[in-house]
Amino acid sequence: MAMRGFTLFSILVLSLCASSIRSEETETKEFVLTLDHTNFTDTINKHDFIVVEFYAPWCGHCKQLAPEYEKAASALSSNVPPVVLAKIDASEETNREFATQYEVQGFPTIKIFRNGGKAVQEYNGPREAEGIVTYLKKQSGPASAEIKSADDASEVVSDKKVVVVGIFPKLSGSEFDSFMAIAEKLRSELDFAHTSDAKLLPRGESSVTGPVVRLFKPFDEQFVDSKDFDGEALEKFVKESSIPLITVFDKDPNNHPYVIKFFESTNTKAMLFINFTGEGAESLKSKYREVATSNKGQGLSFLLGDAENSQGAFQYFGLEESQVPLIIIQTADDKKYLKTNVEVDQIESWVKDFKDGKIAPHKKSQPIPAENNEPVKVVVSDSLDDIVLNSGKNVLLEFYAPWCGHCQKLAPILDEVAVSYQSDSSVVIAKLDATANDFPKDTFDVKGFPTIYFKSASGNVVVYEGDRTKEDFISFVDKNKDTVGEPKKEEETTEEVKDEL
């Protein structure tokens, strides 16, 4: 999934984070290490295994996580060997370089650092203390557990989770090394085990001696084997086989891990949203499964969403419940294709038309305001060309989110800047709600809010990296603006800035 400031993935899974009430502060020992720019690198370098939470003091989910994280740190401090939990305020100016370095896209983000920081993995576990402890005990142990007995097998392989088991005639050699490398790489996502006796496993051919990889799963065909131990091929097999043919998004928490994997995939994503209890639901599901089956292995992943539980997706795509049943396809470059009020006999042909390039992209946009008389002009997707890109004017454009605290603080400052340019018709100060409007990602790289760009009258587009004061904005605009009609300046390039994650 392409990295964006607040992605559909973020919107869908925020509600899955465990909630808790912050306990009153006491003077008891704190087990979570506090890091900053002065000790972050040294601390990471000296630990073989350390977990770091990137947080912001104003973040509600960070506040909910804090007491659970502290409880887990206390429990894990007595583990053998101890597991160290740490935190860093990544919103602090002097610490932001670490958020950028480790691609932190939102708060809280938890990373697992191994071997002095040489290997870094996402934390994909629970957000409550007991779950954190269980997950990290496993993560700090071997990447793959050896199955030596039937009891070992029953403990590792269950009917409720995906487990990847390598079967080898001997626990050495290139195939075994390749398997262990993938286990280490994907250990935060999946459970891995290995054995030299296939008879101990609950499903599949018991006479095989290997080398073979058998992936057990609680859906579709229950297990699948592969004998390709090429690194890339093995990783692809594991990732693709560990996701259902159709990922279901509903209230069932057992489906949530697969929803996360679905949106993390780089595949083109087809999503059908229906009322699960509505008339014709079973016919729609049946036809959708037929289409998914016929497109298996062609770079197209399928999700079936219950409209009642998909408000986050509807908000992200700008959809209405009146459009259900609907199917929307999102490509890797974030283009979207929409078919509303779809009927059973239209699903297959519409997907084929999409693959054949016959469907026009869908663009999410708020309505163009009937009146736009405030000093800071409102821009939506449908007016972006007229007000900004093709306006022939110098435009300072803020990309914001309604929930963003820094954006709210910036609003009156931009109002003052706009008022100061009211007598200069060549300058426009504008804003665009980036959560409700599509915009060209190749022109505007928005990974946090607020992000501010300046488009000169001659067409140069640069990101604003200065301080957020009236005087600094005015100085920047005056320095970079063109006199309307003057020759186009040579394009400048600037490094990407991420103000708020």
Swiss-Prot record:
GO molecular function per UniProt: protein disulfide isomerase activity
Site residues (Lowers pKa of C-terminal Cys of first active site), renumbered to this chain: R127
Sugar-modified residues: N39, N275
Site (Contributes to redox potential value): G60, H61, G405, H406
Phenotype of null mutants: Reduced seed set.
Tissue expression notes: Highly expressed in flowers, stems and immature seeds, and at lower levels in leaves and siliques (at protein level).
Superkingdom assignment: Eukaryota
Pfam family, any one: Thioredoxin_6
Active site positions, chain numbering: C59, C62, C404, C407
Protein function: Protein disulfide isomerase that associates with RD21A protease for trafficking from the ER through the Golgi to lytic and protein storage vacuoles of endothelial cells in developing seeds. Regulates the timing of programmed cell death (PCD) of the endothelial cells by chaperoning and inhibiting cysteine proteases during their trafficking to vacuoles.
Stated family: Belongs to the protein disulfide isomerase family.
Protein name: Protein disulfide isomerase-like 1-1
Annotated organism of origin: Arabidopsis thaliana (Mouse-ear cress)
Gene name as annotated: PDIL1-1
